[in-house]
Amino acid sequence: MWVLKGWISGAGKAIIMEKLVKQMENQKTGKLYLCATPIGNLDDITLRVLNTLKEVDLIAAEDTRHSIKLLNHFHIKTPMTSYHEYNKVDKAKYLVEQMKNGVSIALITDAGTPGISDPGEELVRQCYEAGVPLTSLPGPAACITALTISGLATRRFCFEAFLPSDKKKKQWILEELKRETRTIILY
């Protein structure tokens, strides 16, 4: 934020304004990269994800203790912060502010694709609301891996992710799924 003092006038003010406009034009909004990570074998990571993790300013990780193994394996030194189920709303606000100030951020989960039964939804929603650009770098997703090796129909499927721990809710969902004709994927 810039404040011009009232004592600057005429040509001096015009020059300063011109410089400020150029600075503002040169300021870039950061970007969110949703980076899929390996679901078992570290070598399943894509080159694009590796390059992105090395180039961004910050990595937001579901569990930094878990993700450090991946980063160390590939000699990635990018700073990391936590972004998980229990801090997602407040942390998403913070991360969006960082991106609005030009910081590029990669979001990774412990395994698989952010937002698919892992943290990511809230941050993506807030990025859209704030006009922060984002992109998804495809890679492993456990549900698709399971589907492809199941031998079941793959053209149409239903992904329900994790069933609730509440017994009544779980029973209700299972009763609903009995009528489902598509292949069902559950975690």
What spans do the regions from the language model cover?
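Beta-strand/loop-alpha-helix module characteristic of Rossmann-like adenine-cofactor folds
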Residues: 18-25, 29-30, 145-187
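Glycine-rich, flexible N-terminal cofactor/catalytic loop recognition
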Residues: 18-86
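Residue-level preference for the first positions of well-ordered beta-strands
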Residues: 30-34, 102-106, 183-185
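Short active-site oxyanion
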Residues: 53-59, 131-134, 183-184
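Short hydrophobic/aromatic-enriched beta-strand-loop microsegments
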Residues: 77-85, 134-135, 155-161
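Glycine-rich, highly charged phosphate/nucleotide-binding loops
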Residues: 87-95
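Short glycine-cluster motifs
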Residues: 101-158
